[in-house]
Structures are given as C-alpha cells and as structure tokens.
Amino acid sequence: MLHYPQIDPVALHLGPIKVHWYGLMYLFGIFAGWYLLRYRAKVKSWAPIKPEQAGDLTFYIALGVILGGRIGYIIFYNLPYYFHNPLQMFFLWDGGMSFHGGFIGVLIAFALYARKLGVNFFDLGEFVAPVVPIGLGAGRIGNFINGELWGKVTDSPIGMIFPTGGPLPRYPSQLFEFFLEGVVLFTVLWLVSIKKRPRYLILGLFMFLYGSARFICEFFRQPDPQYGYIFFNWMTMGQILSIPMIVLGAIILIIVFIRTRKNKCENI
C-alpha cells in the first residue's frame, strides 16, 4: 500500500487570505497555456491569432473554464445541494469543477472570440487543443492534494488511504487521470502537432482520446455519491458525459481520413 502524502491544501497564508494549491494549479495551467499559445502563434504559419493576441485568447479560455466548469459541476453533479446552499457556489477553493462543463464553457468562449476576430471556430480549436492537457493535468494534481475524487476501494499495492475516504485503501484515480489526461494526451497531441498533418486531425484526436481516457479512468474512480451508477450498474455520470466527446471525435477523424484519401484535406 502506498502512503498518501499529507499536504496542506492551503499553500500560503497571506494574512487573512488563504491561497489554496487547487487555485494555484489553475493559475499554473492558465500561465502555461498562455506561454504555449504564444509560442505556437509564433511558429505556426496557419495560426488564427498573432502572438500578441495569446493573452486575450487565454483570458477567454480561462473565463470559459472557470464559469463553465463550476456551472457544469453544479448542474451535472450536485444541483440539489447548491440549490439549498447557494453561497457555496462561489467557494471554488473547496473543489467542485466539471471538465465537461468547462469544455462547454470553452466552446462558448471560442465562438465569442472567433466572432470578435473574424476567424474560423474550428481553426481556433485545432490551434488550442494541444495545450489543453497541461491544464487538465494540473487540475488533477489539485484534486489529489485536496484529497478529493479518490478511487474505489482496492487491495492493490498501489492503494492509498485518503483522509476523507474512510479506513480502506483506494485507487489514487486522480493520478491515473493526471497521467492519461495530462501527460499522455499532451505528449501525443504535441508530437503530432509539430508535424505536417491534415487540418482538424488534432481537434478530432483531442476529443476522442480525452473522452476515451476519462471513460477508462471512471472504472477506477468512486462514483459520485449523489448519483452512484446510472446505467447497467457500472456506468457513471462522467462516462455518460464522455460518450458524446468520443463519438464526435471519431466523426471528425473519419471525415479527416476520408477527405485525406480524396486529397481534399489541407495539410498544415
């Protein structure tokens, strides 16, 4: 059995202000995202933005992630609780963000920013997709430090006893998600993105691979107590929300493949 590192969720005390690791992980993801978007805007001739516009784009994305992620968590996972405790909606440092809600928020942000600049919505998604796993991985580290979203009970040697997870060891599912959604997804997308490839291949890969990684990790993660298993005594809310991403990603990849075979897909 592995030992869960007892890390104080509060990284810094600035007088009465508590700076949480969870928030710092989001700040790291935002800053790293801005840096990489600026770099990509410099080196990609097809980039839909100029390097100096990376800050504005990052602001739109961050707003979409935070608002969409929080609203999505409230609606998808815990609406009755927040209905009776409305002020808790604003306590972001306690955790409670939904990737799928954040994804919807980012799509809305893309639409607004693309309209503002007069650029193609899908080109913007293709441009940003390789950078997204940085933020996903950072968020999962924040979950791990908070000791939340732990996995199912296990007798595996990699099990951990979490402070809020009861006396039995559980899978460190946050680290599984950090590895698949963060490290693996970033590595694959970045390596593909630095080569000549059909347009929108990265966008399709991101949606398909993220949805698949999340679907797999949900088998190790403890279901949300307010829902449990929704279908077949094994399917969770996270898996249900991932299915549309997998399907849409597969459709994009099939279209890219067909257009490539017919020499109708531009390489970028």
Curated annotation (Swiss-Prot):
UniProt entry keywords in alphabetical sequence: Cell inner membrane, Cell membrane, Membrane, Transferase, Transmembrane, Transmembrane helix
Database matches in InterPro entries: Lgt
Highest taxon in the source lineage: Bacteria
Top-rank EC class of the record's enzyme: transferase
Keyword hit for Transferase: yes
Principal subcellular localization: membrane
EC numbers, comma separated: 2.5.1.145
TM region(s), chain numbering: 17-37, 57-77, 90-110, 117-137, 174-194, 200-220, 238-258
Role played: Catalyzes the transfer of the diacylglyceryl group from phosphatidylglycerol to the sulfhydryl group of the N-terminal cysteine of a prolipoprotein, the first step in the formation of mature lipoproteins.
PANTHER family: PHOSPHATIDYLGLYCEROL--PROLIPOPROTEIN DIACYLGLYCERYL TRANSFERASE, PROLIPOPROTEIN DIACYLGLYCERYL TRANSFERASE
HAMAP family to which the protein is assigned, alphabetical: Lgt
The name this protein goes by in its record: Phosphatidylglycerol--prolipoprotein diacylglyceryl transferase
Organism: Francisella philomiragia subsp. philomiragia (strain ATCC 25017 / CCUG 19701 / FSC 153 / O#319-036)
